A protein has these predicted regions:
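Alpha-helical elements of Rossmann-like donor-binding domains used by nucleotide-donor carbohydrate transfer enzymes
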Residues: 38, 71-74, 105, 109
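Catalytic active-site module of serine/aspartate enzymes centered on a nucleophile-bearing elbow/loop
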Residues: 82-112
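Alpha/beta-hydrolase-fold enzymes
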Residues: 1-31
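Short alpha-helix in the alpha/beta-hydrolase fold that links the catalytic acid
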Residues: 54, 67-77
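Active-site nucleophile elbow and catalytic-triad environment of alpha/beta-hydrolase enzymes
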Residues: 30-49, 54
Length: 112
């Protein structure tokens, strides 16, 4: 059992979006219901996780329409006391496949 996948505009790079939808052999056009069940299970696991004192660096685009990033940021902030957040104005979900000006900001936010 599968569901039809909807490809959203989640990057500002039109060539990448075309590739993703029409040429990438690793992008399914139908999603197994088991994948959706696995995602729901993962959400429950992260919500029930006790958290961690380890520092994490979250890089998030403010036009990401693929996931509920506002909810995720709030949840991660509660779970990880040492979280730093870099919000990238105008960036979507596929951050490394964004326009060059956005990628520069994204890569500058990476802290090793």
């Amino acid at each position: 059992k599968t569901l039809k996948r909807v490809f959203r505009k989640n990057s500002h790079d039109p060539e990448f979006l075309y590739f993703l939808k029409h040429q990438d052999p690793f992008q399914p056009h139908r999603l197994p219901k088991a994948w959706i069940s696995a995602m729901a299970k993962w959400i429950t696991q992260i919500e029930n996780h006790s958290g961690s004192p380890f520092p994490i660096n979250v890089i998030q685009g403010d036009v990401d329409g693929t996931l509920d990033w506002q909810y995720n940021i709030e949840l991660l902030d509660k779970k990880f006391a040492n979280m730093t957040l870099a919000m990238i104005r105008g960036a979507g979900h596929h951050m490394v496949n964004e326009r060059e000006d956005l990628r520069e900001k994204i890569f500058a936010a990476i802290k090793l």
